[in-house]
A protein has these predicted regions:
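Twin-arginine (Tat) signal peptide motif
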Residues: 1-11
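Non-catalytic cap/lid and distal C-terminal segments of serine-dependent acyl enzymes
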Residues: 9-18, 24-271
Length: 271
């Protein structure tokens, strides 16, 4: 069966592709990695049982320091399973020593909506305390996201700032330079776009390590290039590729290695 992916779907930050059906089975277990998952009720998403997943370096049997954690944000149409089923993010846990946590975020573009749903607050005020309770280091975290999640990673990093975020990776980020360009449903209205515009957040993002990866055939490439031009401190890679699982999977190892290095940097680049 062939599948046609429309430009409109891509511009919505969508990643709801046929292989998402594999999410229900979960990822294959990887040597040296412990996988756990669970659910919680969220006051930031009333009426929804929120799923989370965690991949962390396997316990060695001795007391070890709290492991640093990367929060991975899925794209439109995804869920907590998506980073495992698509880019197999768990494969990069043991080599880097980083834990990776995922959570359901819906299709709300990781910010507070008129409906009262706020997946960004869900991450900061509920997921991070949950992870801290499991012995992970959450005083400083890293963020990675794809498509809608790439936008969300930049947005949350700008809100938390350099003292809480060691580094952020935005892959094929769903970015728009004006409200009229944005996908239907990405923002409630023009004011919502302005309040959550990551272009205007670049002065904060300039104070922490930012990595941008986007394929040259991706429909978001123009906006990502424009974003990078106003953020010269970012590590930007615009190489051959499209808005596809193939491109995202190929970037993941280098991205996780890059994030592991950000934890050795000072907690803030500016006072």
């Amino acid at each position: 069966m062939s599948t046609t992916i429309t430009r409109r779907a891509l511009l919505a930050g969508a990643v709801a592709l046929p292989w998402l059906a594999a999410c229900s089975t979960g990822p294959d277990r990887t040597a040296g990695v412990d996988l756990t998952e669970g659910t919680f009720s969220s006051r930031f998403w009333p009426g929804h049982e929120v799923r989370w997943r965690l991949a962390r370096p396997a316990a060695s049997g001795s007391v070890a320091p709290a492991q640093p954690v990367v929060v991975a944000l899925h794209g439109h149409g995804g869920d907590a399973d998506w980073p495992f089923a698509s880019v197999h993010i768990e494969r990069h846990v043991a080599p880097t020593g980083l834990a990776v946590a995922t959570v359901d975020g819906g299709d709300f573009y990781w910010h507070a909506r008129r409906s009262g749903i706020d997946p960004g607050a869900l991450v900061v005020r509920e997921l991070l305390p949950l992870l801290a309770g499991k012995g992970l280091a959450t005083d400083r975290v890293a963020l990675i996201g794809w498509s809608m999640g790439g936008y969300g990673a930049l947005l949350l990093a700008s809100r938390l700032g350099p003292r809480r975020v060691s580094g952020v990776v935005a892959t094929s980020a769903a970015l728009w330079q004006s409200p009229g360009d944005s996908a239907p449903g990405a923002f409630d209205d023009r004011q919502d776009f302005v309040r959550n515009d990551v272009f205007s957040a670049r002065p904060v993002l300039a104070r922490l390590p930012v990595r941008l990866d986007c394929g040259s055939e991706d429909p978001f490439i123009a906006a990502n290039r424009a974003f990078a031009r106003g953020l010269p401190t970012a590590t930007a890679t615009f190489d051959p590729g499209a808005h596809t699982e193939t491109y995202w999977t190929a970037q993941a190892a280098a991205q996780m290695t890059w994030l592991s290095r950000t934890f050795t940097k000072p907690a803030a680049l500016l006072p």
